[in-house]
A protein has these predicted regions:
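Non-heme di-metal
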Residues: 1-106
């Protein structure tokens, strides 16, 4: 069971690193640093390869029908259960940027 938890944690970490590096690449492009942007994109691709390997090892890639159902379930859960309290809490704390970010994710 610890290995499955480790795979889940590794998958989450690799996935987050991928998205972060792509955001860094975009910023480097905006600052006219194409070489650095390319480096970040290469690192992001490597993180994707790692994340996919972890997902496969967890048995997380199934038939397309199963994958579609999983995606629908996940998006519905975010929309109905995750983001509404996040929006409310950000609003209560006066954090407009977080409130907007959470609301746009719904």
């Amino acid at each position: 069971m610890a290995t499955l938890d480790n795979l889940k944690g590794a998958f989450a970490g690799e996935s987050q690193a991928n998205r972060k590096y792509l955001a860094y690449a975009k910023k480097a492009d905006q600052e006219n640093l194409p070489g650095i942007a390319k480096l970040f994109r290469a690192a992001a691709h490597a993180e994707t390869v790692h994340a996919h390997a972890h997902l496969r090892a967890m048995g997380g890639i199934k038939s397309t029908l199963d994958n579609l159902q999983d995606a629908v379930n996940g998006e519905d859960f975010e929309f109905t259960r995750i983001y509404p309290p996040y929006v409310a809490e950000a609003k209560a704390e006066g954090n407009a940027a977080a409130e907007r970010s959470f609301a746009y994710a719904m």
